[in-house]
Design a protein with these regions (language model features):
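Iron-associated oxidoreductase/ferritin-like identity signal
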Residues: 1-187
Length: 187
């Protein structure tokens, strides 16, 4: 792989990441789970910030634009949901949706970590040490997000996706991510 191909693939993956987090934010907003919604709004902003930094790095260090890759819509939201209103979602549907959403998030972050680690290795193999170090920062960031997503998944499994547990953490998560977004916006 060339440096250009590596950055092109990373950029496309980040665009898809923004799409996934935006769709998960709508997914949870529709389910009236505002803590989870706020979580994915935050991660969408982070993903966009990392993508901008990636583009800026490539332009400033390689003096080129990153070529675009076709990006497939991740279709996180089931098409059947578009026929319903929020108040028509029953408890079992909500529980199953939370389970599916968390599993998608963990799978996405796992895939992302693998891609970033491979990009790091490939850049080192090409002798692009500085670029590899830039990507190493992304590996560490996604590793932290994956740890958080996996812990959330384990907690929900332990609680057997109890609707009481799910609803009980929404206010805390909403406020916590609201504060994180305020801090994020200052930088």
């Amino acid at each position: 792989m060339t440096v250009e191909e590596i950055f092109r693939d990373l950029s496309a993956h980040m665009v898809k990441g923004v799409m996934i987090h935006e769709q998960l934010a709508d997914y949870y907003d529709f389910l009236n789970l505002h803590g989870y919604k706020r979580c994915h709004e935050y991660h969408s902003k982070c993903e966009m910030k990392y993508m901008r930094k990636l583009h800026r790095y490539f332009i400033n260090h390689y003096n080129k634009l990153i070529e675009e890759n076709p990006i497939e819509n991740p279709d996180v939201i089931p098409s059947s949901w578009y026929r319903y209103k929020r108040d028509e979602v029953d408890v079992n549907t909500k529980r199953n949706a939370v389970k599916a959403g968390i599993e998608k998030w963990v799978a996405w972050e796992t895939e992302t970590k693998t891609l970033y680690e491979q990009a790091y290795i490939d850049l080192l193999d090409l002798g692009e040490v500085a670029a590899a170090k830039k990507i190493a920062c992304y590996v560490c960031a996604v590793d932290r997000e994956l740890k958080w997503a996996q812990r959330k998944h384990i907690n929900l499994v332990t609680a057997d996706y109890s609707i009481s547990y799910i609803l009980g953490e929404q206010d805390y998560l909403h406020d916590w991510y609201k504060d994180k977004m305020k801090h994020y916006d200052k930088h």
